[in-house]
Amino acid sequence: MTGESGAAAAPSITLNDEHTMPVLGLGVAELSDDETERAVSAALEIGCRLIDTAYAYGNEAAVGRAIAASGVAREELFVTTKLATPDQGFTRSQEACRASLDRLGLDYVDLYLIHWPAPPVGKYVDAWGGMIQSRGEGHARSIGVSNFTAEHIENLIDLTFVTPAVNQIELHPLLNQDELRKANAQHTVVTQSYCPLALGRLLDNPTVTSIASEYVKTPAQVLLRWNLQLGNAVVVRSARPERIASNFDVFDFELAAEHMDALGGLNDGTRVREDPLTYAGT
């Protein structure tokens, strides 16, 4: 299946709850309502089926409008949203899920994530309990976490006996998250990457541009392909339709092992987003 741009539809990965999720999706963090509607519409047109938003982004309603206008059948879509830190708690997380559904104009989300563990707040386990309830009531097909460390995930599993389906984390060659990816895999948790382009910081990197020229691909396409070949699912943000089409045109080539290693070797621990160990969350 291809969209008008020629970009192939992303393959899917099976989660530990047996639901399936596309391996590549559109993120809409920090986009205005107008930008969000245009971006989601453009993504759906070229075959993207995973849309990732959050209460904290303030654009759930815009995502919902674009989905409604697209004519794409609900069962073809995979919609993710996230629980904000102020809504952590057993009851509040369930109320927040229903409120997100109202804004999205949907009966359920495919994936509901705790946006940040927010250790200073100390409520993520209670929030997880509420999300288990939301899943049981059919408001969320799958539930997971974002920005969680291995210790946070182990704590959830030990206290609730329910394993997250996904851990969405900052991941790019400057922060390759090898140890956390291994820990996720040990618990059958899918690693989903955000900021795969390191907010653009890697687009002019000599290693990246050199590899891109060898494959006659853009630096962004090479960075996305690297992430996908690690076995990760990926969410990539863009407001520009032509860039969205290019970002999803990454399934017709494969990076050689030496190029994978060269990109992974750029790891220096650089974060472009907040540190989950100390951040109180949004």
Curated annotation (Swiss-Prot):
Description of what induces expression: Induced in response to the thiol oxidant diamide.
Binding site for NADPH: L197, V235, R237, S238, A239, R243, S246, N247, R273
Positions of the catalytic residues: Y57
EC number: 1.1.1.-
InterPro entries: AKR, Aldo/ket_reductase_CS, NADP_OxRdtase_dom, NADP_OxRdtase_dom_sf
Domain of life: Bacteria
CDD domains assigned: AKR_AKR5H1
Keyword Chloroplast: no
Family, similarity comment: Belongs to the aldo/keto reductase family.
Identification of the protein by name: Aldo-keto reductase BQ2027_MB2996
Source organism (scientific name): Mycobacterium bovis (strain ATCC BAA-935 / AF2122/97)
